[in-house]
């Protein structure tokens, strides 16, 4: 498809290089006047990729800026594109791909007269605050899915987005009643363990992957502790479950990957995320939003029924490109 834009002749997307990043952004690959770069550097050499990853380590560089990062310039995928100075170009980074790019190179791109720089935060600002703060001035538009971050840092709000990468699974191929994967700390841990056992007691099947659990609390048989899943593995399990479970920590807000997966792939959703009430899909009856564990209806989780949200590309990143074009000057 050709994106009809008032301000840009070409879009360049610098993706974060992860499989979940592909799931979020891959619709852009279908846009004729867009270039999709899978990662910051253009190299299949795993040693080089590892060295780049270490040199731009979020943990290390948040404490002390490692020197000589500008040496990566000639490896940047975007540098090899040779941006046409006669075209109006929009370059989009995520917070992750921006933080894996040298600040001086971002400054160089920002100074090009025909380029508009956009950053899209797919994580809360707190997670990489120091690194992002160094780069903010080199972006013309900055978006976040988190309303609190938008209010605190003066960012533009845009809900998270998602691209369909799988075909839906037939109802008779559903293997579990509930699926959860994520960090399980504090209040979340007690909610999740109780929910797991409540489902199992009804004869249902729950598949929970919990991380961040203290050794003394890893005693619930049937729960998977600290078992890493690739995003492909996560999607495999989402496709085969009846209900996706999402338990948010205190202070978190905004639409999440789990919620979008449930809606896009027609799964029931159990969540304590109040943000889902703002969605038109909330009235479908396939989403249960609870305040306390006592509010959870186990029958909602285990009862099998055909789920259809009538989803029609509502979360596609194509709409973000349209928004960016609207906000451009």
Please name every model-derived segment.
Residues 1-122, 141, 276, 317-318, ...:
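N-terminal pre-catalytic "stem/leader" segment of glycosyltransferase-like enzymes
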Residues 18-20, 126, 143-151, 210-216, ...:
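Short, polar loop motifs at secondary-structure junctions
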Residues 28-38, 48-57, 139-143, 151-164, ...:
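Active-site regions of enzymes building and remodeling cell-envelope glycoconjugates
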Residues 79, 196-214:
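A conserved nucleotide-sugar
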Residues 84, 135, 236-237:
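Structural alpha-helical scaffold elements that stabilize or flank donor/cofactor-binding regions
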Residues 87, 138, 239-240:
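Alpha-helix C-terminal capping/helix-to-coil transition sites in glycosyltransferase folds
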Residues 98, 103-200:
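Catalytic core of nucleotide-activated saccharide and alditol-phosphate transferases
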Residues 208-322:
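Donor nucleotide-activated moiety binding/catalytic core segment of transferases
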């Amino acid at each position: 498809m050709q994106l009809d834009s008032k301000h840009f002749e070409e879009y360049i997307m610098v993706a974060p290089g992860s499989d979940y990043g592909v799931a979020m952004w891959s619709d852009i690959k279908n846009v004729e006047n867009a270039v999709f770069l899978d990662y910051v550097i253009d190299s299949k050499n795993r040693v080089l990729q590892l060295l780049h990853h270490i040199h731009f380590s979020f943990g290390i560089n948040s404490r002390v800026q490692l020197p000589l990062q500008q040496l990566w310039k000639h490896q940047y995928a975007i540098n090899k594109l040779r941006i046409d100075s006669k075209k109006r170009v929009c370059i989009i980074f995520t917070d992750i791909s921006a933080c894996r790019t040298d600040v001086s190179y971002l400054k160089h791109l920002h100074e090009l007269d025909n380029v508009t720089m956009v950053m899209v935060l797919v994580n809360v600002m707190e997670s990489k605050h120091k690194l992002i703060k160094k780069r903010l001035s080199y972006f013309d538009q900055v978006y976040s899915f988190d309303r609190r971050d938008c209010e605190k840092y003066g960012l533009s709000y845009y809900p998270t987005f998602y691209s369909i990468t799988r075909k839906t699974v037939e109802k008779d191929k559903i293997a579990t009643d509930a699926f959860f994967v994520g960090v399980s700390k504090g209040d979340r841990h007690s909610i999740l363990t109780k929910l797991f056992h409540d489902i199992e007691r009804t004869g249902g099947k729950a598949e929970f992957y919990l991380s961040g659990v203290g050794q003394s609390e890893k005693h619930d048989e049937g729960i998977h502790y600290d078992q890493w899943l690739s995003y492909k593995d996560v999607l495999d399990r989402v496709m085969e479950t009846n209900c996706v479970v999402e338990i948010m920590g205190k202070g978190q807000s905004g639409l999440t990957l789990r919620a979008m997966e449930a809606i896009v792939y027609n799964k029931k959703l159990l969540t304590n995320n109040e943000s889902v009430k703002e969605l038109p899909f909330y009235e479908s009856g396939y989403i249960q939003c609870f305040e306390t564990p006592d509010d959870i209806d186990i029958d909602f989780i285990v009862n099998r029924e055909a789920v259809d949200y009538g989803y029609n590309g509502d979360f596609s990143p194509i709409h973000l490109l349209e928004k960016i074009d609207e906000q451009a000057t």
